[in-house]
A protein has these predicted regions:
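Cyclophilin-like peptidyl-prolyl cis-trans isomerases
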Residues: 3-6, 10, 16-189
Length: 189
């Protein structure tokens, strides 16, 4: 009888460890790049509305084949312009990439105290703090001037070496000619 209780306690303990892993999986975004996958742990506890919108866009395939239109070495790589950033065909407008968003509404700012450092994923926006929509950026390094000014939505937990290989832009704005792209973006897989 005592052995049965120990086995049952062990099974219950194993089940309690399995539950959080499943919850974390629902907030895992995988970005497939030409050099390999990048896994981002999304943080709905910091930015629930932003994370919800990213998940919705990813689940609809809206981020697939979208270019990294602005990449500044030593700063960040920006992507997610689903309106203008599609690679190939008529949907790719290099002169307009970075100017759009998605068909979904803009999201009010959800600023936090989480610092912008290497691997942090933040939402891009215009001058208005409440203008984030679909575009996001991945930090190459720490950048304190962004802290509390932009919404943090996640952090790269693996594949940062693949982010480092994204083709860099030129000039002060980091516009990229013949840019790399997100081949496929999935959430919870």
């Amino acid at each position: 009888m005592k052995l049965l209780h120990l086995a049952l306690a062990g099974a219950m303990m194993a089940a309690s460890f399995a539950a959080p892993a499943m919850a974390a999986d629902a907030n895992t975004m995988t970005i497939q790049l030409k050099d390999g996958p990048v896994v981002v742990q999304l943080m709905p506890e910091l930015a629930p509305k932003h994370v919800k919108q990213i998940k919705e866009l990813a689940s609809k395939g809206e981020y697939d084949n979208v270019v990294f239109h602005r990449v500044i070495d030593g700063f960040m790589a920006q992507t997610g312009d689903v309106e203008f950033g599609k690679q190939g065909g008529k949907s790719f407008a290099p002169s307009r990439a970075g100017m759009g968003g998605s068909a979904l509404p803009d999201i009010p700012a959800e600023f936090s105290r989480t610092p912008f450092e290497r691997g942090v994923v933040g939402m891009a926006r215009s001058q208005s703090p409440n203008s984030a929509n679909s575009q996001f950026f991945i930090m190459f390094t720490k950048y304190p001037s962004l802290d509390g000014q932009y919404t943090v939505v996640g952090k790269v937990v693996s594949g940062m070496e693949n982010v480092d290989k994204i083709k860099k832009g030129t000039g002060g704005n980091g516009e990229v000619t013949d840019p790399d792209r997100m081949l496929k973006v999935t959430v919870g897989q």
